[in-house]
UniProtKB/Swiss-Prot annotation:
Official protein name in the record: Pertussis toxin subunit 1
Residues annotated as the enzyme's active site: 69, 163
Keyword DNA repair in annotation: no
Predominant subcellular localization, coarse grouping: secreted
Impact reported for residue 89 to G: Very low amount of final toxin secreted; approximately 50% of wild-type toxin level accumulate in the periplasm despite near wild-type levels of mature size S1 in the periplasm
Other noteworthy facts: Thiol:disulfide oxidoreductases DsbA and DsbB are required for periplasmic toxin assembly, whereas DbsC is important for extracellular toxin secretion. Experiments with temporal expression of PTX indicate that holotoxin secretion is at a rate of 3 molecules/min/cell. Also, more of toxin chains S1, S2 and S3 are produced than secreted; one half of each chain is incorporated into holotoxin.
Record's subunit section: Pertussis toxin contains five different chains, S1-S5. They are organized into 2 functional subunits: A, composed of S1 (which is toxic) and B, containing S2, S3, S5, and two copies of S4 (B binds to the membrane receptors). Dimers of S2-S4 and S3-S4 are held together by S5.
Gene designation per UniProt: ptxA
GO biological process: symbiont-mediated activation of host G protein-coupled receptor signal transduction
Organism expressing this protein natively: Bordetella pertussis (strain Tohama I / ATCC BAA-589 / NCTC 13251)
Amino acid sequence: MRCTRAIRQTARTGWLTWLAILAVTAPVTSPAWADDPPATVYRYDSRPPEDVFQNGFTAWGNNDNVLDHLTGRSCQVGSSNSAFVSTSSSRRYTEVYLEHRMQEAVEAERAGRGTGHFIGYIYEVRADNNFYGAASSYFEYVDTYGDNAGRILAGALATYQSEYLAHRRIPPENIRRVTRVYHNGITGETTTTEYSNARYVSQQTRANPNPYTSRRSVASIVGTLVRMAPVIGACMARQAESSEAMAAWSERAGEAMVLVYYESIAYSF
């Protein structure tokens, strides 16, 4: 059963049904983080290369709690103090996120709330030892501080998760190139242009094979249901998406999504 279908069923029958489905259908193969870490990751951003090629990406703050980041508590919708910069090993999913934002601009224009013009960027980044798998870091946190409730769905999450967290900063030297996507709200034409970064330093590096070890959250530890998309978690994905909308978005990417139950910070989507 595709996870997108399971998500739709979850909306109708509740998360307990979803947990039962994943407990039965979870893969028995090696988890995704057992594979070689990616050499290249991607990030959607609205900032132009004139800024990013010069300054890179810098995290909002120094909160290095992985769960705070993945649930959005330390991101822009929360306290804006995350110590991580979100990226994804899936270029396709990053492209779909950009398409989603572009469609929002088009729909806003139709509703009389904008021009329909849109500019977005997909940055191609060389991963190195400062990039950590979100899924493996999450389960490291559960093993260290929780009661291992999340282990039930470890196989299912590992199959679909592709977020990688850069700690503190991504320097300009790690940013290989950018694809600029422009949608003309008047003509409806969409054009893409690629620019290379003159400051990029070519090296043979990969993301860290080990999880990031978080300090424990100071927030209450309670059982909660958290959406783990295959890209950028809550720091790039929209918090207000319904399960139906997120399932449709994921299906467009040809990927899948999972819901993960774990003992973590209380957070309401």
